[in-house]
Amino acid sequence: MDSAVDMADSERALNLTHIRFQLIRLEDTITFHLIERVQFPYNKTIYTPGAISIPDSKLSFFDWYFFQQEKLQSLIRRFESPDEYPYFPEAVQKPILKPLNYPKILHNNTVCVNDKIKKFYIEKFLPKVCPDFGREDRGEAQENYGSTSTCDIACLQALSRRIHFGKFVAESKFQSDPEYYTKLIQAEDREAIGESITNAAVEKQVLDRLRLKVETYGKDPSLLEGVEQPIKINVDAVVSMYKDFVIPLTKEVEVEYLMQRLIPEE
């Protein structure tokens, strides 16, 4: 919810140096949230509708909690920020705080990939990184369902912010060469647009930096150097998530945003 990019200054918000700084900070945020999450087992029960009885709701425990959390957060303006996208838009309420007057930064668009993020995170990623304690789920009386869900929400919102930041990159690229991108958009050449915003060297730097961070943050710094210790999270799984999911999905967001860039705004 915090932002190193000043959304009150449209020029600064679209400065690639400042965007890059924010993306690097989000690597830290995501890494720490994931390390917190893997203290707990997968706890599949919380994602299964009907597995936990909730009065007047057919949602899973996790979705119910997430809905309520975003409802509360909307009251304090979280989703007024141009870089925040709710997983449950129907939960968003009118803020109790006076509105912040953000300038126009992004072109109007409908690009939101939160459903893809949540599905991948719950169904693909968590089973790879959550610890196996060698026992069955012991149920709501003994498992940390609330703490697990709280960690999940933090992870998912940070991932959403990281991935949707691609819109700011795309808008910055468009403004740097509108004639070039207009031709590609009019030709509906998604492949060429994707190639124009891809930098393999930068992607490698991101993955190398992320690996170092996960390895570093996943250890106890108080132990003597050279002392063997287990790392708190599966480093390869986190790096793979970025390589095979976060980076490609960010690129998809960038391309689809640009495909809507020429649509007249009302």
Curated annotation (Swiss-Prot):
Protein residues bound to L-tryptophan: N144, G146, S147
UniProt cross-references to Gene3D superfamilies, sorted A to Z: Chorismate mutase, AroQ class superfamily, eukaryotic (1.10.590.10)
Name recorded for this polypeptide: Chorismate mutase
Amino-acid positions noted as binding L-tyrosine in the UniProt annotation, renumbered to this chain: R77, R78, N144, G146, S147, T150
Keywords, comma-separated and alphabetical: Allosteric enzyme, Amino-acid biosynthesis, Aromatic amino acid biosynthesis, Cytoplasm, Isomerase, Phenylalanine biosynthesis, Tyrosine biosynthesis
Changes seen on gene knockout: RNAi-mediated knockdown decreases chorismate mutase activity. RNAi-mediated knockdown decreases cell population growth rate. RNAi-mediated knockdown decreases antifungal activity against Fusarium oxysporum and Botrytis cinerea.
GO MF: chorismate mutase activity
Its biological purpose: Catalyzes the Claisen rearrangement of chorismate to prephenate. Acts at the first branch point in the aromatic amino acid pathway where it steers biosynthesis towards phenylalanine and tyrosine, and away from tryptophan.
Annotated S-S bridges: none
Pathway(s) it belongs to: Metabolic intermediate biosynthesis; prephenate biosynthesis; prephenate from chorismate: step 1/1
One term under GO cellular component: cytoplasm
Chief place of localization: cytoplasm
Quaternary structure, from the entry: Homodimer.
Enzyme Commission number: 5.4.99.5
Induction, per UniProt: Induced by aromatic amino acids and chorismate.
Residue stretches making up the Chorismate mutase domain: 7-263
Native organism: Trichoderma parareesei
Gene name of this polypeptide: ARO7
Record's subcellular location: Cytoplasm
Description of how activity is regulated: Each dimer has two allosteric binding sites that can bind the regulatory effectors tryptophan or tyrosine. Can bind either one tryptophan or one tyrosine, two tryptophan or two tyrosine or one tryptophan and one tyrosine, which differentially affect the catalytic activity. Activated by tryptophan and subject to feedback inhibition by tyrosine. In the presence of both tryptophan and tyrosine, the enzyme is in the activated state.
GO biological process, one term: tyrosine biosynthetic process
Catalytic activity reported: chorismate = prephenate
